[in-house]
Amino acid sequence: MPREDRATWKSNYFLKIIQLLDDYPKCFIVGADNVGSKQMQQIRMSLRGKAVVLMGKNTMMRKAIRGHLENNSALEKLLPHIKGNVGFVFTKEDLAEVRDMLLANKVPASARAGAIAPCDVTVPAQNTGLGPEKTSFFQALGITTKISRGTIEILSDVQLIKTGDKVGASEATLLNMLNISPFSFGLIIQQVYDNGSIYSPEVLDITEDALRARFLEGVRNIASVCLQIGYPTVASVPHSVVNGYKRVLALAVETDYSFPLADKVKAFLADPSAFVVAAPVAETAAAPAASAAPAKEEKEESEESDDDMGFGLFD
């Protein structure tokens, strides 16, 4: 099959990205630094049936999106984030599920000289198995060692590289000698597009319980503020009613004004002991009946025992 010319390829690419933007309401903008073609193929296969990966030149992606803004103006929010080595992952599935699938497709990678470290790298205390001739190599990196049974032993954990630092040749060589692959590379989610809204991927970690807790906290804050300023809202009205009722009771107690519930409060304040004694009286009345029953049972058992004593072994 003859290869299509560049103009045809561009035209088909524009049609493809526009079709995907129309068919899929959600997508990720992903960074693809240090992702090789073999790993990309594995990612596509693992996402088959769940999501579609589309890579391309930033200028072409921007041009396709700008040409489609008349049909969907919300796509303009994507344009500021199309920079660097990025692509799209389109999906109709749950975003958190697809995110987890992308994370599962990261592969460990060795440190290369000149690469920017995506994370801190710490060399743990260990016996390296390397001969004493490598001691100067560790000393040059400021790593404290000792010779143990003819091999070099690192005495304590050492932070070799910090996030964002450029990996030096010595650091890369040491990590390779120790068979440490400190980095993992894959598609990194940079932004999330969901039905016209765009937000950072950290939002996907917010659970329903966290949302519920934040909502209740907001309701409590609103109720507190409204109570202080005397502004009625749905959140504050129940508290206002209770507080108002307490004030009415207090007023009734201090004046001659009364109503049935206030009468109970006045009676309690006049003679609290009447309410305290009422409960023990009921308990005291029940106590003799309860004690009488065991006494009766005990008497019956005693009579049965006496009857048994009347018969001898040879009667």
Curated annotation (Swiss-Prot):
Record PTM: Phosphorylated.
Lineage: superkingdom: Eukaryota
An annotated GO BP: cytoplasmic translation
Positions in coiled-coil regions: none
Keywords: Phosphoprotein, Ribonucleoprotein, Ribosomal protein
Gene Ontology CC terms, in alphabetical order: cytosolic large ribosomal subunit
The protein, known as: Large ribosomal subunit protein uL10
Gene name for this UniProt entry: RPLP0
